[in-house]
Every structure is written in structure tokens, then in C-alpha cells.
């Protein structure tokens, strides 16, 4: 069950929304307001006087303090507690670095991604997605209040792990080269202090504005990196040299707890693992106008919500599910696909699922 709570009212004002088999679509579905005339990149010569100016120019920005410190500290505590109590407790202790190993934890990739276990629908994941300061930033970018959110993973990267393969740079952009222009704004909420030695997001400053020129020149490159989806492009050594020749600078973004990092999907980026003594935790948050999703998209998204599946960073459920979660080469026995705790959704949070915008009769998907 998903418990929907009106956070603006008393704690007792709750309603329950089923997310076990089928979630009823309202008899009066909402009609989403499309992106407005002030959507990012829709105007020329405009100055916003806020974070959008940096986002336009650089292809990325840090929205400081999107979540108040006391609440983000609570989320950090919940995430650590989740790991310490995972599967009844496998031996991880946040105060003992010797316990940071796969046998004591959920499977976490070398890039810090925790992808299975229904974590896309854990209570702390949904609480972060519903934060007003996070939603507000995307509202401003798209110029509409009617948004849907991705059911994406979280990052729980610990420093100096030797039980996973090295995290080598993987510069890429999450956008089909044949579909140019601004299409998707990616984001993450930073949980712990993130400095120079703490790993994190690396971006190629300003390269989003060169994306069309780059792909026109590299359209027939002979050593193109394989991708499982057209919405991903990996940069080769030749591509990296092209960016360097254009004067593009790679920047490691530092952030404080509660900061929201945003980047245009055309911006080349990758992540680094922490090397100091602090872990890097973040939750990926990506929103798009509900009007940009087709009814078929929304039905796929509804089914993913009901089955507590993930959808990568695309809010329109372009990709549902994920890679197999393997422990010692076998499917992880702890991966039930169900969250440990029931998330609590406010009215706005439930709209972010996309379900209230479904206009047609439900179908089996």
C-alpha cells in the first residue's frame, strides 16, 4: 500500500492509495498544463535572475539548500539505517569501515548505484522527491506545475572499496544524438558534505551548447561505443579531444547536504567514487511536464508504480525495470523488488506518479 498524506494538514489527515495490483484512475482525470512560454531554451536573450541563467550558460547548476539541513540530515540517517538493517542486518556498521563489503550490504555497483530491492520506492526516496524546494526548481525550468517524476535509483558510494571493480571515468550524455535540443533536465539531491575527495558528479561545462555540432561531426565515427539504448552516448578519446579543442572544461561539482544538482541531458558527465573518509550519498530526481508523456507512457508508468519498479531517469517511463541484481554471480536472494518501508505520498506526490493524468481506461501492460 502507498499511504498518501496531506503534509499541509494535520498528521491524522491521511488517505490510503493501493499500489499492490491496480491503482484506480480517477473518474475525473486531471488535464496537465503543458510547458509554458518561459520553458528553458524557449526564449532568446532572456535573463531570469536565478539559477536558470547558470543552467543556460553552463549546462549545469547547483541549487543551494533545496532541502533544509534538518530534513536532509534525517534522510541521510534513514539511508544509513536502511543499510544497517538491510535483510534483517547483514553486518554493516556505519562506524566500522571493515564492514563495508558486499556480503554486508545490498548490491551496490562500482559507480555507487543501488538499483534493486524496490529502493526507487523506499520511503526516504519518495520523501526526497516530494520536497517543495526540489519540485520548485523543475517547475521554474519547465514553466508548469504539472510534472511527473522518475522512479530512479539512489547512490550509496563508500570510499576505498576493494570488493568492487574500479570506477573508471565513463563520460557520456543521456540523450539520443539524433534528437537535438533541450529534452530532459537531470537532477540529484546531495545528502552528505561532498568536497574534492568525496567523489561525485563531473560535468563538461558549456558542452551542451556544442552538442549538435559535435554529433554532426561524429555521426559516422568508426569506434562508436555500444549503448543499450539510443538515449545514451559514450564519448571516445577522439570525442574527448574534440571537446578539449573547443575549450570545454571538466568540473567536479562540490555540494553541501540538501543541495540540488541539475544538468542538461546534453551535458557530458560521469561520476567519481569517494577517496577520502566520507561516503557519497544522493538521490536522483528527474521531472518533466506530464503533458509531454503520452497516455501509453502514463499507463506504463502506472504499472511500474504498482509493481514498485524503477524507470531510470526518464519520468515518462521510457525504460522500465533494470539490470539483473547479482550477488556472487547469482540473482540476489534479498532482491524482492519491494521497498522495506511504505512511502507516504501527499496529494502532490501522487500527481508526480502520473496516475491522476491518465485519461483512458486502464489496460493491462
Could you describe each region identified by the protein language model?
Residues 2-7, 17-57, 64-178:
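Non-heme Fe(II)-dependent double-stranded beta-helix
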Residues 30, 92, 218-219, 257-262, ...:
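Non-heme Fe(II)/2-oxoglutarate
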Residues 121-127, 173-175, 238-252, 270-273:
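Active-site rim elements
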Residues 139-148, 177-181, 190-198, 209-210:
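Secondary-structure boundary elements
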Residues 153, 158, 173, 185, ...:
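Short, structured patches in soluble enzyme cores that scaffold and shape functional sites
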Residues 156-159, 204-212, 286-292:
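Short edge-strand/loop segments of extracellular domains
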Residues 171-184, 248-249, 255, 278:
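A short beta-loop-beta micro-motif enriched in histidine and acidic residues
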Residues 184, 194-268:
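Double-stranded beta-helix
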Amino acid at each position: 500500500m502507498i499511504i498518501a498524506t496531506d503534509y499541509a494538514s494535520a498528521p491524522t489527515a491521511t488517505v490510503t492509495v493501493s499500489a499492490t495490483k491496480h491503482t484506480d484512475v480517477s473518474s475525473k482525470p486531471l488535464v496537465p498544463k503543458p510547458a509554458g512560454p518561459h520553458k528553458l531554451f524557449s526564449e532568446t536573450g532572456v535573463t531570469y535572475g536565478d539559477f536558470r541563467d547558470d543552467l543556460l550558460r553552463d549546462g549545469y547548476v547547483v541549487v543551494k539548500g533545496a532541502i533544509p539541513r534538518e530534513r536532509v540530515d534525517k534522510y541521510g540517517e534513514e539511508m544509513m539505517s536502511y543499510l544497517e538493517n538491510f535483510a534483517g542486518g547483514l553486518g554493516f556498521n556505519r562506524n566500522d569501515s571493515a564492514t563495508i563489503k558486499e556480503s554486508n550490504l545490498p548490491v551496490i555497483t562500482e559507480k555507487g548505484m543501488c538499483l534493486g530491492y524496490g529502493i526507487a520506492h523506499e520511503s526516504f526516496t519518495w520523501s526526497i522527491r516530494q520536497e517543495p524546494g526540489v519540485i520548485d526548481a523543475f517547475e521554474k525550468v519547465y514553466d508548469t506545475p504539472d510534472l511527473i517524476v522518475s522512479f530512479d535509483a539512489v547512490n550509496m558510494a563508500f570510499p576505498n572499496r576493494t570488493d568492487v571493480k574500479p570506477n573508471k571515468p565513463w563520460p557520456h550524455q543521456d540523450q539520443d544524438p539524433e534528437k537535438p535540443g533541450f529534452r530532459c533536465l537531470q537532477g540529484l539531491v546531495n545528502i552528505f558534505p561532498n568536497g574534492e575527495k568525496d567523489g561525485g558528479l563531473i560535468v563538461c561545462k558549456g558542452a551542451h551548447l556544442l552538442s549538435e555540432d559535435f554529433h554532426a561531426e561524429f555521426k559516422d565515427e568508426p569506434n562508436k561505443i555500444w549503448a543499450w539504448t539510443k538515449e545514451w552516448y559514450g564519448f571516445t578519446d577522439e570525442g574527448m579531444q574534440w571537446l578539449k579543442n573547443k575549450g570545454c572544461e571538466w568540473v567536479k561539482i562540490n555540494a553541501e547536504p540538501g543541495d540540488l544538482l541539475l544538468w542538461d541531458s546534453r551535458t557530458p558527465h560521469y561520476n567519481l567514487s569517494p577517496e577520502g573518509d566520507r561516503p557519497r550519498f544522493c538521490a536522483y530526481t528527474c521531472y518533466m511536464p506530464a503533458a509531454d508523456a503520452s497516455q501509453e507512457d502514463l499507463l506504463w508508468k502506472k504499472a511500474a508504480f504498482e509493481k514498485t519498479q524503477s524507470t531510470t531517469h526518464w519520468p515518462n517511463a521510457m525504460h522500465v525495470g533494470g539490470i539483473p541484481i547479482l550477488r556472487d554471480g547469482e540473482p540476489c536472494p534479498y532482491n524482492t523488488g519491494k521497498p522495506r518501508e511504505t512511502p507516504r505520498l501527499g496529494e502532490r506526490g501522487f500527481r508526480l506518479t502520473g496516475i491522476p493524468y491518465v485519461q483512458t481506461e486502464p489496460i493491462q501492460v
